[in-house]
């Protein structure tokens, strides 16, 4: 081959995106050092707490019932309002050997030394957050399509939620329910653990796992229950 031919060949070589490669590499390192070691993921919503309970007491009961991961998701609270609540839950989850993830507020997660952060569709890019928190924190990402689950992996997430699987008022803004077939396809194609989200009850949890879900993410079935400890236990039977 002539020198010109070799030069043209070199010019045609694909350009390596070093930042992208580093994000994927860091994601793989994070998965080895900080695995997703829970399959019931409780997401908070203090507006659904029944009479006679506080958000703290509901979560405490859920932890007694076997929940091993809490996502603090109170979208209408400011950072100053969220921080003391996160500090209380950090102490509580440590007492029960459970994980605490903070929705969106990376600053709060770092301040209370949470186990991770959970990012939604309007959050900062996952790869940006991964660079900020390093490999010690878990990053969960909300997804609503198979393409989004793959993007989450490429950008450094550790796991994803996928939904809504069933009809649920709390996720009505995300459109019609995806159904079990879409969940199964997302689980089949995703390199990450997938948590089924949206309308999940203890009965439906079995269907979601049969479709390939690594675990389930729950809000009202436990947070809104008059017996949250019993409700939490029902997901492990």
Name the predicted role of every residue range.
Residues 179, 196-201:
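Glycine-rich adenosine-cofactor-binding loop
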Residues 213-221:
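Short, electropositive alpha-helical surface patch
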Residues 1-11, 15, 22-29:
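Short, low-complexity, charge-dense intrinsically disordered segments
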Residues 29-124, 131-158, 175, 185, ...:
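Conserved N-terminal beta1-alpha1 strand-loop-helix module at the mouth
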Residues 156, 211-214:
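As written
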Residues 170-172:
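Glycine/threonine-rich flexible loop motifs
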């Amino acid at each position: 081959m002539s020198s010109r031919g070799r030069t043209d060949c070199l010019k045609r070589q694909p350009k390596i995106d070093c930042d992208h490669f580093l994000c994927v590499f860091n994601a793989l390192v994070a998965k080895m050092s900080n695995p997703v070691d829970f399959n019931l993921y409780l997401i908070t919503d203090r507006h659904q707490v029944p009479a006679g309970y506080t958000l703290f007491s509901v979560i405490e009961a859920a932890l007694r019932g076997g929940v091993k991961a809490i996502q603090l998701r109170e979208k209408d609270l400011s950072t100053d309002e969220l921080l003391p609540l996160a500090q209380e839950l950090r102490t509580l989850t440590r007492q029960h050997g459970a994980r605490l993830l903070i929705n969106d507020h990376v600053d709060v997660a770092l301040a209370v030394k949470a186990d991770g952060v959970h990012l939604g569709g309007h959050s900062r890019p996952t790869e940006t957050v991964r660079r900020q928190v390093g490999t010690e924190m878990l990053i969960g990402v909300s997804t609503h399509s198979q393409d989004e689950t793959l993007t989450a992996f490429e950008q450094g997430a550790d796991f994803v939620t996928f939904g809504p699987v069933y009809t649920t008022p709390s996720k009505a803004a995300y459109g019609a329910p995806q159904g079990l077939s879409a969940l199964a396809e997302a689980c089949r194609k995703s390199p990450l653990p997938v948590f089924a989200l949206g309308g999940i009850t203890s009965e439906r949890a079995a269907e979601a796992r049969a479709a390939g879900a690594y675990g389930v993410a729950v809000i009202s079935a436990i947070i809104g229950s008059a017996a949250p400890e019993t409700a939490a236990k029902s997901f492990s039977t």
